[in-house]
Amino acid sequence: MAHPTQLGLQDASSPIMEELLLFHDHALMTVFLISTLVLYIIMTAVSTKLTNKHLLDAQEIEIVWTVMPALVLIAIALPSLRILYLMDEINDPHLTIKATGHQWYWSYEYTDYDTLNFDSYMIPTQDLLPGQFRLLDTDNRMVVPTGSPVRMLITAEDVLHSWAVPSLGLKMDAVPGRLNQTTFIATRPGVFFGQCSEICGANHSFMPITIESAPVKYFESWSSSMLAES
């Protein structure tokens, strides 16, 4: 999760987020190099005696400032397109979960089980226990097995929402009457927080997302207890 005064993105907890972090660093380095070059040209132009101020034609430099930006754009576009295709790949998921956005909470349905579904509300500030996070913790966490491919089906019941968990590299719009899908693999155990990322009304800020990644044995125990309660 994010921390006060943090610089950079959250720690990656999925393969896609690791790819996004690498692309982020790649893009920032490209911007840094371009900025350094532009600053050097400006400083050189300021300090020169303008001996070529009447020069009207320079084919070589025109070729350079046409080809170089094209190469830079290609260097940014290719890894970006690769990540976009990776995010669309869904290969043999071990678990499918349907998340539905409401004003203002989320409901989850484990479609591989007959009756495993529940609502997930933000815990009010006055009900928080020691160690729980204000505006982030929920009364029911979405539990997934660590290291297993999980397919998410995202929709909404009323207005537009967006299901987003930054440390897993997830952000998918929840649209009424439409099913969007994405996939992720939690590479380590832990609790990951997200929030609705589409303004959806007065309590938009109060519909967090809490995902708990746990070993398979714990997940099986949790699912059995949830099925017994239902």
From Swiss-Prot:
Compartment annotation: Mitochondrion inner membrane
Binding site for Cu cation A1: H161, C196, C200, M207
Mitochondrial intermembrane-side segments: 1-14, 88-230
Transmembrane segments: 15-45, 60-87
Record-listed Cu cation A2 binding positions: C196, E198, C200, H204
One of the record's GO cellular component terms: respiratory chain complex IV
NCBIfam families tied to this protein: CoxB (TIGR02866)
Protein name as it appears in the record: Cytochrome c oxidase subunit 2
Species whose genome carries this gene: Polypterus ornatipinnis (Ornate bichir)
